[in-house]
Amino acid sequence: MTEDRNFDDIAHKFAKNIYGSDKGEIRQVIVWEELEQLLCAVNGSRKSLDVLDAGGGLAQMSQKLAKLGHRVALCDLSLEMLQLAKQDIEKNGLLEQYRLIHSPVQNIAEHLEQPVDVVMFHAVMEWLADPKPALETVLEQVKPGGAASIMFYNHHGLVYKNVVCGNIPHVLEGMPHRKRFKLQPQKGLKPEEVYKWIEDAGFEICGKAGIRCFSDYIGNREYMGDYKTEDVVALERQ
């Protein structure tokens, strides 16, 4: 039986391996550039916005919004992740901008008094047993005229990654989740399906971007040409 992933058991490892790496840095750079465009579209008057960071984990991205004066409701299933996030938020002097909510995203409506201007739902659906209703619930929290930033693990990218690594039998078997890879998502989502879910919820898709389209396929540097992280970021921006 597949269950929603709770990172209480490996929160510190998650923080180090996912965000404390070149891959994490590249992801944050590209995602932030996309968020800046979203903010310009939603916030022409430059007022403070109400933001929901649904399944926001360590709150790296939403802290950038808080620094701009926006108010953030940070929701996560993992209490350990929330505690780590609180420490970092407090260290950065942003605690007054935050409301921390220990809850699965599926129950977030119980914790919000009113809809929000912006929803961030990043890298959560691939860890859920049933992502579609969770996405629908999150989108229901967006007020008219607001916007949502949705990021998910691309099924096609997962197929390609396994093929490049020579895991062809695994692909032919349907890529069942391997429990020993605790930081590997339970599933990838097919973009065409997610786009339909979003549109069926009454939203117009205003932009799309690939995150780490190249860096995930760069192999062992010992056998490759010389390059720097900045070079990979420049490639991702193309």
What are these regions (language model features)?
Residues 1-55, 60-64, 84, 88, 147-174, ...:
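Conserved class I S-adenosyl-L-methionine
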Residues 60-107:
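Class I SAM-dependent methyltransferase SAM/SAH-binding core
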Residues 120:
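A conserved beta-strand element that flanks and buttresses the S-adenosyl-L-methionine
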Residues 132-147:
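A short glycine-rich, Lys/Arg-flanked "PGG" loop and its adjoining helix->strand segment in the class I
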Residues 185-202, 208:
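Short alpha-helix
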Residues 207-238:
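A C-terminal cap/extension of S-adenosyl-L-methionine-dependent methyltransferases
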